[in-house]
């Protein structure tokens, strides 16, 4: 395995044919109220041998758009939103190809970029996941790799804040917006943590990949587009949900890797901090900030009380 944040060794000079690259990949996409962006995503993967779309209880036109643009895709319509990671796991269970391309509904990729990712996967057989450089809607390069979660928290800032490296790089963490996943690695370490509804699920998978002996490789020559925010509705209800799960998942991941005692200590500090912030913002007539802080408080309290991130859900795996 290549050392983290070092230049990956090997070569990607043997670029496969684009059609060959698509034939080795199954695309997995999870949608939730994604009608605004899923059309561009679907068009970008029309050449794929297999596309698997898991819809998490959208009530917009997400499914209709997928059905129209990708009539041969496997479209699974979940009656309830079981979370991003659970949806991805449903898709992974149906992948029979060598690789899965995990593609957010607000992202697009072309055949040339995919071919570069597949070539890198062939060049670095120890890579469990590979990611491209991410290009935002305004054309700037987004951060797409970083230190591992706990090192990142200690550093206080992102590692990837400038231009991407010139060649492949082995990293501790890759963005989950677009990932080429080696299925043999995923089957070894397991898919996303089903306890996590939202946030930190990609950190958890990256940690387990590396613990399992697999490297994570950034392939900056491959570029994918990432609009961001494509599976959400920007209102106070969404704001609440977002920060509730942010609070819960942060403590779940802390307890999972560094012990419940440490997580409880963090939780108590969070409760004290965000109770005061929520009250102050409410009194200052700042509703969005008050909702944010109250949600963070409530999600953290729910974890501390042993409540799950979501109510009991039906088994979605075989739907």
Write out the residue ranges for each language-model feature.
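Short aromatic/hydrophobic "clamp" motif used to bind/position activated sugar donors
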Residues: 100
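Short, flexible, basic/aromatic active-site loop/helix in glycosyltransferases
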Residues: 149-172, 176
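Non-catalytic, C-terminal membrane-associated alpha-helical segments of glycosyltransferases
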Residues: 241-248, 260-319
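Glycine-rich, basic loop-to-helix element that forms the pyrophosphate-binding segment
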Residues: 78-95
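Short, well-formed alpha-helical segments that are part of the catalytic scaffolds
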Residues: 29-47
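Conserved donor NDP-sugar-binding/catalytic core segment of glycosyltransferases
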Residues: 111-143
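A conserved acidic beta->alpha catalytic loop
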Residues: 44, 55-64, 80
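A short, conserved alpha-helix in the catalytic core of glycosyltransferases
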Residues: 172-190, 195-223
């Amino acid at each position: 395995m290549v050392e983290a944040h070092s230049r990956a060794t090997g070569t990607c000079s043997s670029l496969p044919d684009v059609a060959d690259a698509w034939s080795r990949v199954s695309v997995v996409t999870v949608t939730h109220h994604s009608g605004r962006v899923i059309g561009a995503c679907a068009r970008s993967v029309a050449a794929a041998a297999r596309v698997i779309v898991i819809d998490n209880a959208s009530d917009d036109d997400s499914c209709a758009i997928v059905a129209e643009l990708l009539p041969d895709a496997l479209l699974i319509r979940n009656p309830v939103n079981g979370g991003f990671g659970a949806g991805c796991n449903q898709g992974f269970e149906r992948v029979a190809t060598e690789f899965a391309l995990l593609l957010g509904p607000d992202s697009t990729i072309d055949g040339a970029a995919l071919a570069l990712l597949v070539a890198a996967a062939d060049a670095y057989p120890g890579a469990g996941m590979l990611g491209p450089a991410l290009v935002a809607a305004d054309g700037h390069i987004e951060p797409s790799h970083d230190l591992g979660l706990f090192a990142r928290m200690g550093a206080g800032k992102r590692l990837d804040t400038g231009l991407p490296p010139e060649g492949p790089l082995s990293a501790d963490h890759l963005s989950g917006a677009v990932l080429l996943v080696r299925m043999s690695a995923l089957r070894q370490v397991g898919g996303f943590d089903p306890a996590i509804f939202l946030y930190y699920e990609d950190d958890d998978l990256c940690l387990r990949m590396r613990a399992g002996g697999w490297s994570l490789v950034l392939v900056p020559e491959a570029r994918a587009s990432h609009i961001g925010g494509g599976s959400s509705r920007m209102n106070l209800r969404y704001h609440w949900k977002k920060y509730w799960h942010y609070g819960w998942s942060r403590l779940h991941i802390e307890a999972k890797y560094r012990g419940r005692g440490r997580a409880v200590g963090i939780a108590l500090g969070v409760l004290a901090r965000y109770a005061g912030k929520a009250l102050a913002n409410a009194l200052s007539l700042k509703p969005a900030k008050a909702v944010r802080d109250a949600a963070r408080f409530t999600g953290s309290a729910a974890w501390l009380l042993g409540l799950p991130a979501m109510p009991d859900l039906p088994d979605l795996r075989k739907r």
